[in-house]
């Protein structure tokens, strides 16, 4: 590949990155062409295809405009993934090392009101109905701020002494910790020791009305 072509390819990658950060969604092929001075949409498609093969972007075949810059793409551009991107670290499940950023399955545009938290944020997908009374449903994604302590009443992600990650409301009581579900049919978890991984500060629900 010529240096000119490679430079144009990186211009395409940077425009995709900048548009997603600015608007929260990727540009159209025509918008990419206009931004990097390419009149041929087939040429733009060619650059997009090569960027995907390099692992710099990923496309969702079920969504026509779903283009995301990958961690490798961020590195190629020399930009940080924060504060504009939150790593999505999978599901709250037993025994998983969910706080390793290299385990990120995706990246999510950070809401403007949470930008001050910067790289201290991550997202997890909730499995189960233990928090339905406060509107956290099965399949929701929660935005979590990394912290190792919590105040009574905080909604947290914690690692229990059975090495299971869970989302509950936190209470420090006389001689134990109580992890309280927000579901009237479920009992609290009582623990002698608990490891706080972070405090839930936001929620995202992917809803499609047809």
From Swiss-Prot:
The keyword Transcription applies. This is LexA repressor. Keywords: Autocatalytic cleavage, DNA damage, DNA repair, DNA replication, DNA-binding, Hydrolase, Repressor, SOS response, Transcription, Transcription regulation. One of its GO terms (biological process) is proteolysis. Represses a number of genes involved in the response to DNA damage (SOS response), including recA and lexA. In the presence of single-stranded DNA, RecA interacts with LexA causing an autocatalytic cleavage which disrupts the DNA-binding part of LexA, leading to derepression of the SOS regulon and eventually DNA repair. The active site is at residues 130, 168. It is an enzyme of class 3 (hydrolase). Homodimer. It comes from Lactiplantibacillus plantarum (strain ATCC BAA-793 / NCIMB 8826 / WCFS1) (Lactobacillus plantarum). The gene is lexA. GO terms for molecular function: DNA binding; serine-type endopeptidase activity. The keyword DNA damage applies. Residues 29-49 bind DNA. Belongs to the peptidase S24 family. Its EC number is 3.4.21.88. It catalyses: Hydrolysis of Ala-|-Gly bond in repressor LexA. InterPro entries: ArsR-like_HTH, LexA, LexA-like, LexA/Signal_pep-like_sf, LexA_DNA-bd_dom, LexA_repressor, Peptidase_S24_LexA, Peptidase_S24_S26A/B/C. SUPFAM superfamilies: LexA/Signal peptidase, Winged helix' DNA-binding domain. Gene3D superfamilies: Umud Fragment, subunit A (2.10.109.10), Winged helix-like DNA-binding domain superfamily/Winged helix DNA-binding domain (1.10.10.10). The record marks 94-95 as: Cleavage.
């Amino acid at each position: 590949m010529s240096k000119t072509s490679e430079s144009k390819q990186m211009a395409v990658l940077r425009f995709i990155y900048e548009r997603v950060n600015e608007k929260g969604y990727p540009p159209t092929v025509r918008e990419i062409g206009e931004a990097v001075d390419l009149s041929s949409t087939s040429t733009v498609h060619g650059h997009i295809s090569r960027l995907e093969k390099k692992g710099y972007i990923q496309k969702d075949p079920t969504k026509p405009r779903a283009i995301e810059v990958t961690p490798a793409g961020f590195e190629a551009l020399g930009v940080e993934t924060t504060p504009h991107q939150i790593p999505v670290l999978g599901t709250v499940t037993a025994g998983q090392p969910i706080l390793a950023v290299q385990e990120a399955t995706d990246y999510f545009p950070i809401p403007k009101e949470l930008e001050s938290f910067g790289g201290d944020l991550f997202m997890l997908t909730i499995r189960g109905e233990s928090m339905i009374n406060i509107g956290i449903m099965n399949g929701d994604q929660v935005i979590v701020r990394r912290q190792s302590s919590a105040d009574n009443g905080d909604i947290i992600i914690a690692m229990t002494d059975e090495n299971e990650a869970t989302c509950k409301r936190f209470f420090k009581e006389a001689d134990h910790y109580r992890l309280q579900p927000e579901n009237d049919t479920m009992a609290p978890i009582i623990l002698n020791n608990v490891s706080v991984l972070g405090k839930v500060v936001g929620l995202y629900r992917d809803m499609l009305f047809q």
